[in-house]
Design a protein with these regions (language model features):
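Conserved histidines in hydrophobic membrane contexts and catalytic metal-binding motifs
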Residues: 1-505
């Protein structure tokens, strides 16, 4: 009785989920190589011109006065529409001040957005189709981008699309025909990023969690049923021969693939559910906030009076600087200049520049933020390790790993070129590290470092899962067709067929 009930639940849940799980597996192959289009800070820097030092006439203190800030969490100098600007943020309030005239930027004009988009794409603005957009579309559906609406959207005949935020003047999204195709093959179906659903964040989240939980259940039931029915002693017969599996046709293939891939299917569905934070998980270690505050302190109005940004840039001679960050590291005011080459220079208020922090300096900064005897060691890493990794190799290297001697064996990864915290691991993060990243992406240390071995193994599992789902789709269609046929067949016809010994269709 219990077995029949489990079979019924597996069958009908499978009918309901077959198409969705098929899409997840098939799009998982795309996700191995293509992500959802996005614009990172490094993308903006790569396309930004170098700062014109001679045009910077406004001090940081003057910029603070212009926007009415006494302090700021972030302050940097960069180029906007060919002019140097200060970008200041205090909490959730962000302001832009032109560093050549001390004028505060209001909402950007269409003409300015035209120049920004043309500079980004390298194409003539006259060839673009332009529209103002306040509504969320497929490429601005992610929350960080959606918050920067309204935008000007530019589309060129070759398929390039550039979205310029009217509020910040930044390019917040950029797509090409290839990147959009990659998203349609991978991220959009895999994440259920259908715009009418995704723009309602809470509803989308609940739906993904429910579908993933149901898929986990259906895979677990299928695996249980398969193990119940599997007979190592070949107690079933088919075509006059003893067999281990009591099914024929598509059911037989479904059972074989399910026994081979059922565990993988179940863990993929479960780990995918974990990506949505279905239940509260422990966060970062308590020392994280103290370390972040030490590495990026609050900037006061007069913090950089001893050396203005223009003077700091001049101290680098002819170096082409794209961005100048004003930071407070361990209560010491510093400038972090990002060069055209991508390298950085750290400039003190005495005008002395260096390329990075040394390992002992980073360790001392962390020790100042926590109990001094908590620091168990600090080392430089030139390659990713098991807790600091990036399959697409976008996270910075080298980094300084600072280990604490606390109960959670906390690990902090700090970029020595910027003194920025770029990674954290604590024993309480094991669920995210191993049950999500480990099971969902197979980001295991013995595998993810080795390409194309990782591609072969993960791709093989994805293809096998897709094949398993193909059998599910066929069986789902057969179940639905049989059920509908019975419902549409008159009752007297069913009784007549039964009396005459004809099988039901």
């Amino acid at each position: 009785m219990i077995k029949r009930g489990l079979v019924a639940v597996h069958r009908w849940l499978g009918v309901a989920l077959a198409l969705n799980v098929f899409v997840w597996f098939a799009s998982g192959i795309g996700m191995m190589y293509w992500d959802f289009p996005s614009v990172s800070s490094s993308d903006r820097l790569a396309r930004s011109p170098a700062l014109d030092v001679a045009a910077i006439h406004v001090s940081l203190a003057d910029a603070f006065d212009t926007v009415g800030f006494d302090s700021a969490d972030e302050a940097r100098v960069e180029t906007l529409d060919g002019r140097p600007v200060y970008r200041l943020r205090n909490g959730r309030t962000a302001r832009i001040v032109y560093a050549d005239t001390r004028e505060m930027r209001r909402a950007g004009s269409r003409e300015q957005a035209d120049r920004i988009a043309a500079q980004w794409s390298g194409q003539h603005i006259a060839a673009a189709t332009v529209r103002g957009a306040d509504e969320i579309d497929q490429w601005t559906v992610q929350l960080p981008v959606a918050r920067l609406r309204p935008v000007w959207q530019y589309t060129w005949p070759d398929g390039e699309q550039v979205y310029v935020s009217q509020a910040t003047g930044e390019v917040i999204q950029y797509t090409t025909r290839a990147s959009r195709l990659g998203a349609y093959v991978g991220a959009i179906p895999h994440w259920l990023y259908v715009t009418p659903l995704r723009k309602h964040g809470p509803l989308w989240s609940r739906m993904v969690i429910a579908l993933a939980a149901s898929a986990t259940l259906v895979a677990a039931l299928g695996l249980t049923i398969g193990m119940w029915t599997f007979s190592p002693s070949r107690r079933y017969w088919h075509a006059g021969m003893p067999v281990r599996i009591p099914y024929r046709g598509w059911k037989r293939w479904h059972a074989i693939l399910g026994l081979l891939l059922g565990v993988a299917a179940m863990t993929w569905a479960f780990s995918g559910m974990l990506s949505m934070d279905p239940f509260p998980l422990p966060g970062d270690p308590p020392q994280t906030g103290h370390i972040e505050e030490t590495l990026r302190g609050t900037i006061q109005r007069d913090t950089f009076d001893a050396l203005t940004p223009a003077a700091a840039l001049a101290s680098l001679g002819n170096a082409k600087v794209k961005q100048l960050d004003c930071v407070l590291v361990g209560a010491q005011p510093l400038y972090v200049a990002t060069l055209e080459s991508g390298d950085t220079r750290i400039i003190s208020l005495t005008g002395v520049a260096r390329s990075s922090f040394e390992v002992p300096q980073i360790a001392a900064l962390v020790a100042a933020a926590v109990l001094p005897d908590e620091v168990a060691g600090a080392t430089r890493l030139d390659a990713y390790d098991r807790y600091y990794l990036d399959r697409r190799r976008g996270r910075p290297l080298p980094v300084v790993l600072v280990r604490l001697g606390d109960r959670g064996a906390s690990r902090f990864y700090i970029d020595p070129k910027t003194a920025r915290l770029v990674g954290v691991y604590h024993a309480r993060n094991w669920v995210t590290r191993w049950l999500y990243h480990g099971l969902h992406s197979l980001d295991f240390p013995w595998l993810y470092r080795y390409r194309p071995l990782w591609d072969v193994i993960v791709g093989g599992f994805m293809l096998g899962g897709t094949a398993l789902c193909c059998t599910s789709l066929v069986l789902a269609w057969q179940v639905l067709a049989r059920t509908l046929s019975r419902r549409l067949t008159p009752a007297n016809q069913i009784r007549r067929d039964a009396r005459e010994g004809r099988p039901l269709q």
